[in-house]
A protein has these predicted regions:
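Basic, amphipathic juxtamembrane/active-site segments
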Residues: 294-319, 405-411
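Substrate-recognition element of Asp-dependent hydrolases with the DxDx(T/V) motif
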Residues: 316-347, 361-362, 399, 482, ...
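Acyl-donor binding region in acyl/amide transferases
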Residues: 521-524, 530-607
Length: 633
């Protein structure tokens, strides 16, 4: 072990003296991280300098921990088929940057299978919330021989898969948490040349078949996610990724300089699982969605469309942005333009994006940070939920500098826009629900509701005019993924900010000691989907509120009162005499500080951190608080 630690020290010395050797990134951006406002944290923004991150790990971590942000704690077990120490340390930096504070269990070298399959008191007491299995093609037990029959090779595939599936199933049964599993990268050499890909005896063919089996398992099992090192290694450069020196000397299965790219991708999956993804774009127009300035050049002279190379660049970028809309991300515009010019530009006959693709279009001469804030407020989102895309570095600096947590990536030249945004990991998809795919329509319907509200003097009359119909039921299997997603994404209207995996939601659903409720809301403008969650834990004659949250899309629609009414009704059925509520303050949930008081609870305690406890005595003369939502059962 002492010898191993000495080798790690040698690696750190190498990192301090090694030249930058990855032309796609740090070779193109020399000393980039050190130029970003002088903060270590900004070194973590893509495109990053991998060697800078590796050599400044401690300083970056110190700055992140002292940043004053509100962290979500989690426990991550790393089960490695090779050395993982620096993978863990760099992953921690990216997670801290995402507002996630991890603690780690790390297996000994190449003990991933033993730790997973056999009793392990240390891992069991650690009780991971997420498991990452770092295996590579170095961990494939046996490859085909040139003399093997097709049947023998099929058995090799089955044997290799049995090793992994048995491990995954034991981990799932024991820990009930998400599992992140590497697929396999391509080998460094091809014994048969190009025939390796098509011949069943080739290593490339064999690895591709194994990867397909991994993907099939991922499709068929919730809470199982692939870290695509096959793509990441190709993107980085396979020859550089698999630097043999690091394997033979230190048992790192990848070049140490490539570790930030791997750690970054794993961190993006974890960030998505914990509800830290961004939710949409705020986009500039001139020289961002098209080439040229619409107010000066006119619509006919904008660069957009297939007729010339410059126009093709912007058309492809618009298509890329529109594909995000199809995934449920919200698109908005903040542009220094006359509104009629902005709309005319968006109606260009060769444009892919049209005005109807956007929720908010703010085209005026106000500072963009003000327009950005107004857009976020209109969407009932925190500004940090949106990504700002603008070709102008001064505008990016103003927005990112004045709005806490907003990312404004350095997108570079137009032909690099897609690559930069795609590698930035803002929208890593782990689960897609029906509500996700309908989100744009839901926000558009909210715009219609806001216009309707303006025509009423009496707010209750406005609510009644919406013709709202609610469904409040005990958790059902069809909605467990959405319920878990909401528990991890909702931050503002969330009393306790407890986070639940889908497996934990399923366990609560099956346990009669809980009253787990979801609420859906439909009105004359459309279906809002699942928008509210309450989890009550019944202990003797008291129902403890473990979780109460609501999507900000339905704020001030009295859905919380409908949920309270149903909770009280079910408590009565169970013989519950009292409901006990808890409020734990965070940097984002101040809006619900007095929620329990509005529901008729009595505050019984408050600590020095502002956490409060409340009680509500259930009586026979309880009167329903909801007067505007018709409930369906």
């Amino acid at each position: 072990m002492l010898m191993f630690k000495s080798k790690l020290k040698i690696i750190n010395v190498i990192l301090r003296i090694m030249p930058t050797n990855h032309k796609g990134n740090s070779g193109k951006f020399p000393n980039l991280a050190s130029s970003r406002k002088g903060t270590y944290m900004q070194a973590l923004n893509y495109p990053f300098d991998e060697n800078y991150i590796l050599s400044k790990k401690k300083k970056i971590k110190k700055e992140l921990l002292e940043s004053g942000r509100d962290f979500t704690d989690t426990r991550i077990a790393i089960l490695g088929g090779s050395t993982t120490n620096d993978i863990k340390l760099v992953m921690e930096l990216f997670l801290l940057d995402y507002g996630i504070k991890p603690s780690f269990y790390e297996s000994e070298y190449n003990r991933y299978y033993q730790d997973a399959v056999f009793p392990n008191e240390e891992l069991e007491s650690f009780a991971p919330k997420i498991i990452y299995i770092h295996t590579t093609n170095r961990n494939i037990t046996e490859y085909p021989k040139i003399s093997d029959s097709p049947e023998t090779i099929d058995e090799l595939i089955k044997s290799e898969m049995l090793k992994f599936t048995s491990m995954w199933e034991i981990l799932e049964e024991k820990y009930h948490c998400p599992i992140i599993q590497n697929n396999f990268e391509m080998p460094l050499y091809r014994l048969m040349g190009n025939k390796e890909a098509s011949d069943i005896h080739g290593k490339i063919n064999f690895i591709n078949r194994l990867n397909e089996e991994f993907y099939k398992y991922a499709r068929e099992h919730d809470n199982f996610y692939i870290c695509d090192i096959n793509y990441i290694s190709a993107d980085y450069g396979l020859k550089k990724w698999q630097e043999p020196f690091y394997w033979y000397m230190y048992k790192y299965a990848l070049n140490v300089a490539a570790i930030p790219y791997l750690s970054y991708n794993v961190a993006n999956i974890i960030k998505s699982l914990l509800g830290k993804n961004k939710k949409g774009f705020v986009l500039d127009l001139d020289n961002t969605l098209w080439g040229g300035i619409v107010g000066d050049d006119g619509v006919d002279n904008l660069e957009i469309g297939p007729e010339e190379s410059g126009g093709q660049v912007y058309s492809e970028f618009q298509s890329y942005i529109k594909e995000h809309k199809d995934l449920g991300l919200v698109l908005n515009v903040a542009s220094k333009n006359e509104e009629e010019n902005a709309i005319a530009g968006l109606n260009h006959p060769d444009g892919v994006l049209k005005p109807d693709d956007f929720i908010e279009i703010r085209a005026n001469w106000e500072p963009k940070d003000r327009n950005f804030s107004a857009i976020a407020e209109s969407l009932t989102l925190l500004p940090e939920s949106l990504v700002f895309v603008d070709d102008n570095p001064a505008e990016r600096a103003i927005v990112a500098g004045n709005l806490k947590g907003v990312r404004a990536p350095e997108i570079g030249e137009a032909h690099n826009y897609i690559q930069t945004l795609d590698r930035s990991g803002f929208f890593e998809i782990t689960n897609l629900s029906k509500d996700d795919l309908s989100r744009n329509e839901m926000y558009k319907e909210n715009v219609k509701r806001a216009k309707l509200q303006a025509s009423f003097d009496n707010y209750e009359d406005y609510l009644l005019s919406l013709e709202m119909v609610g469904t409040i039921k005990r958790f059902e299997p069809i909605y467990t993924a959405r319920i878990s997603q909401l528990s991890n994404k909702s931050n503002q209207f969330n009393l306790t900010t407890r986070r639940y995996t889908q497996t934990e939601i399923e366990e609560v659903m099956e346990d009669e000691a809980y009253i787990p409720l979801y609420g859906k809301l439909v009105d004359k403008f459309g279906d809002n989907g699942v928008v509210s969650i309450v989890i009550g834990h019944v202990v003797e004659e008291v129902c403890h509120i473990d979780l109460w949250l609501m999507s900000c899309r339905v704020l001030k629609r009295d859905m919380e009162f409908a949920m309270m009414d149903e909770l009280v009704r079910l408590c009565k059925e169970k013989g519950v005499k009292q409901i006990k509520g808890y409020y734990y303050p965070t940097a984002k949930n101040n809006m619900v500080r007095d929620f329990y008081a509005l529901q008729g609870f009595t505050k019984v305690s408050e600590d020095e951190n502002g956490s409060t406890e409340w009680i509500f005595d259930i009586t026979d003369d309880y009167k329903n608080k909801n007067n505007v939502i018709t409930l369906q059962y």
